[in-house]
């Protein structure tokens, strides 16, 4: 049995909370939790705590919510906890160099990709969008760069043809805690072997934007279908019709060529709404008009068939 480590945990969303939960079930001691300030949520815009804060409070762990860790006062909060290591998972704040070196074993991060591929804010979505065959998690020793630290452990999983960002998120939320606990065991026993990243192989996962979710019919059907899966559950791919956005939750690729202008509706029936692209045909299967719930193509056609007349061009 390796030594029990004093751990500071820093994270905010559900993905992070699943890692904190694993730590709470381990032999290690979580001595403090750093998480982002409460945010307005819901129709009433009431301040709501994130999943990590809720879990920490349920377990009587001290919670700290600074807007930044740049001030000496907030850095002293970290130092006073006298931690062996700081575990960072989707925290959302940059750690200054002074904080990175405070714990005896430094700070480690769980990142949702196989580094150095997809450094940055949206690795899960970008791996899907790019058509990668696999992804995974990397546990790394943090340094001052953006996801550039030495790698301590990598765990991989395949990306299937029907994975969405939501399903991939769940897969990585199971892999991550496994890798984290194994890495902490290695660190505690002094047997961790850091591996340098090859910067020449690095790619960057830029943050998603709502504008980017608009379907560009000049892409191939395969690219658009991946885009739809990558942007599910947020921000959700869409096209415009009658100056209204229509979200697309599910689509499939028909591997035959059309010589119609990209965006042209070729057919519309109970199997879906078929749209021409630069390469192949995209079959829209689950859609959501503004103000409505997601529905099948057939249900949408029952109420809005005039939107999808063959020969019309979608914006």
From Swiss-Prot:
UniProt cross-references to InterPro entries, sorted A to Z: Fmt (IPR005794), Formyl_trans_C (IPR005793), Formyl_trans_C_sf (IPR037022), Formyl_transf_N (IPR002376), Formyl_transf_N_sf (IPR036477), Formyl_transferase-like_C_sf (IPR011034), GART_AS (IPR001555), Met-tRNA-FMT_C (IPR044135)
Binding-site list for (6S)-5,6,7,8-tetrahydrofolate: 113-116
Source organism: Cronobacter sakazakii (strain ATCC BAA-894) (Enterobacter sakazakii)
Function: Attaches a formyl group to the free amino group of methionyl-tRNA(fMet). The formyl group appears to play a dual role in the initiator identity of N-formylmethionyl-tRNA by promoting its recognition by IF2 and preventing the misappropriation of this tRNA by the elongation apparatus.
An MF annotation (GO) of this entry: methionyl-tRNA formyltransferase activity
Protein name as annotated: Methionyl-tRNA formyltransferase
Any Gene Ontology CC annotation: cytosol
Enzyme class: transferase
Presence of the UniProt keyword Hydrolase in the record: no
Cystine crosslinks: none
Reactions mediated catalytically: L-methionyl-tRNA(fMet) + (6R)-10-formyltetrahydrofolate = N-formyl-L-methionyl-tRNA(fMet) + (6S)-5,6,7,8-tetrahydrofolate + H(+)
Transferase recorded as keyword: yes
EC number of this enzyme: 2.1.2.9
Keywords: Protein biosynthesis, Transferase
Pfam family, one: Formyl_trans_N
Family: Belongs to the Fmt family.
